[in-house]
């Protein structure tokens, strides 16, 4: 039989089979659209917008975009009445800098930095020769600016048409004399709630809605009326405020009008963006540094901690160090937006973590403020370029006094709209289980908790133990299951643990110590080994020359000897796949949009309208 005859026979069989199915009442399948599957996925992903809101920068784009649009996360709102006092959220300045102890703390931190610089030898085996600021000061004091052009080429934002609000670059370049308040709606990774003007939750959410809507219209060219055809993937911090997340989801679905949303954590998205399955994530942002361990798409709750400093603190510290060396631009002010932009630029241009770069070096920079001449300054710098980024590892150098510097994952305060929150689960626990846990609490309370040294050993699981102790004790007290003495003992134990936690959160850890603490909170040695073998640094706060080698050296020197013997290599990754580390988390959100499993995570507008925050508990890919 020839090939043609075989083909005809097979076709005949297929047609015969179809006739039999029709006779049995089986409907013929609908002919699929002649669109390749890959193109269908492309169309679907093209209608998903990924939003990664940062303290200083908003990154937003379609899931199919190669790169997101990055805009300053700031808004300028016009005064409603004439004569209204100006209000500006600070950028580089923060609370706790002008305390009586601040300067002494800065000096002590700088001594530790200098000692660390001197103790580490250069690659040729010799020690660095320290350069005192006096050596540069005499030269810098004599320098005067050269006028490059009588017009800088930059202009203030045109406000002659009296716009109600301005967003992003336009807000940054609003003339300080214009009647506009400046608001940064996110500070240190959380909503910027404060007692000043525009500091209420409602006002902050309104600012965010305006900024995001403007970005969608201008940079993605999507009319707001068409958002009902789009879905959103929102990236949130690992240590998040449930109330704030709930309000953001409500804003996106009910006010902006997206048809659906997936909420996921920055650290997990960073693993998707980098292609790593298990890693210790170190996210050094502009205002906060968060550390946690992620394993197979799960951020381990017990390993999360957030440090209340980042790249902007390095910029401010660099300015202080340059002032000691006679910084020639003497009109520089930390309250001036243009000067803040300049200091950020100088930090990114000159700072490094390379021990081999030493001695005095000549530099120059330009100032191009709006409606001012373009000026060229020349000056000399020595160790200041290395000292400033090293302040991240010795945060006392920032001079921040009386502020909470470390945040751990705490128990949720509960939500009246969520009937199955932790409080409900506690209230419905069996009394027998509660009594058993209360007995275990009393036994563990009798053991002293060490909280000295390098945060290893017994202290490593303190946050989780406190978390469970606090939960269990609260439920037992609520039901009156303990006798008087037992209750007093447990209450004393709880208070001592709360004191230990507050002491820990008052400490300013460097990223290296935070990494060690986070990994040490992992449940098993196998997991710890995996985390030491893969440390991923994302965000823009540690983008300094030789940062990878510097962090790797510090981790190797401080990790427990037991792991040092069995781990072949501590791999610190700062540019996975040669990508910009600032975009890794956003890119991971775009990858998440294309995964098949994401179909189960979508929360739709109608569902949210009917069930509210309960949908987050049901659909979130992390433990809500």
UniProtKB/Swiss-Prot annotation:
Listed CDD domains: ASKHA_NBD_Arp8-like
The entry's keywords: Acetylation, ATP-binding, Cell cycle, Cell division, Chromosome, DNA damage, DNA recombination, DNA repair, Mitosis, Nucleotide-binding, Nucleus, Phosphoprotein, Transcription, Transcription regulation
InterPro entries found in the cross-reference section: Actin, ATPase_NBD
Ligand binding (ATP): 55-56, 283-286
Chain segments carrying region Disordered: 1-29, 430-462
Single GO molecular function: ATP binding
Record's subcellular location: Nucleus; Chromosome
GO CC annotation: chromosome; nucleus
Basic and acidic residues bias (residue ranges): 1-25
GO BP annotations, alphabetical order: cell division; DNA recombination; DNA repair
Phosphoserine, modified sites: 132, 412
PTM sites of type N-acetylmethionine: 1
Role noted for this protein: Plays an important role in the functional organization of mitotic chromosomes. Exhibits low basal ATPase activity, and unable to polymerize.
Entry similarity comment: Belongs to the actin family. ARP8 subfamily.
Subunit structure: Component of the chromatin remodeling INO80 complex; specifically part of a complex module associated with the DBINO domain of INO80. Exists as monomers and dimers, but the dimer is most probably the biologically relevant form required for stable interactions with histones that exploits the twofold symmetry of the nucleosome core.
Protein name: Actin-related protein 8
Organism: Pongo abelii (Sumatran orangutan)
Lineage: Eukaryota, Metazoa, Chordata, Craniata, Vertebrata
